[in-house]
A protein has these predicted regions:
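Extracellular adhesion/carbohydrate-recognition regions
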Residues: 1-72, 105, 109, 117-122, ...
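An exposed tryptophan-centered "aromatic clamp" motif
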Residues: 58-73, 77-138, 147-152
Length: 152
């Protein structure tokens, strides 16, 4: 639910009000922000400003994302595509302005193979630099960029 907020990229402040990035960067230390909120026609997605340190297999990625902050997880395949699309609408610049990193790595989604009877060893990753979502072994090591549905 969007609550009549215009599509764009925002920073959630201490009381969880959404501040436009260009207003946020006027603060004394804009790098205190830990996340951005991507508002689209599909909803409001809160995204960590950088990948978690290290690499993870699929199960480790799910655990690490959940431990980042309450309510966080790896993105769905669809959210990963939304993040890629938003890179061309200012998402990477927003990350940089708050001391984060562009969303260009190869990262885990939250989605394993939907047919575990066929193959229980695979899951989906997204390639942030190109926007591809592909199938990969759950045992490979990839990045984690935690996300959450934004809640006020």
């Amino acid at each position: 639910m969007k609550n009549n907020i215009e599509n764009g990229i925002y920073i959630p402040e201490e009381q969880r009000n959404l501040i436009p990035v260009d207003e946020w960067v006027k603060r004394e230390d804009p790098t205190t922000a830990q996340t951005v909120v991507l508002v689209t026609d599909f909803g409001m997605l809160e995204i960590a400003k950088e990948d978690l340190p290290g690499g993870f297999n699929f199960e480790g990625a799910q655990k690490a994302a959940a431990e980042y902050r309450k309510g966080f997880r790896c993105p769905t395949r669809h959210e990963a595509i939304e993040m890629y699309d938003a890179r061309f609408r200012g998402l990477d610049e927003a990350f940089k302005k708050i001391g984060g990193e562009p969303a260009t790595t190869i990262g885990w989604t939250s989605e394993a193979d939907p047919d575990p009877e066929f193959n229980s060893y695979g899951a989906f990753i997204y390639i942030g630099i190109s926007g591809y979502v592909i199938y990969n072994s759950k045992y490979n090591t990839n990045a984690v960029r935690p996300v959450s549905a934004f809640k006020k």
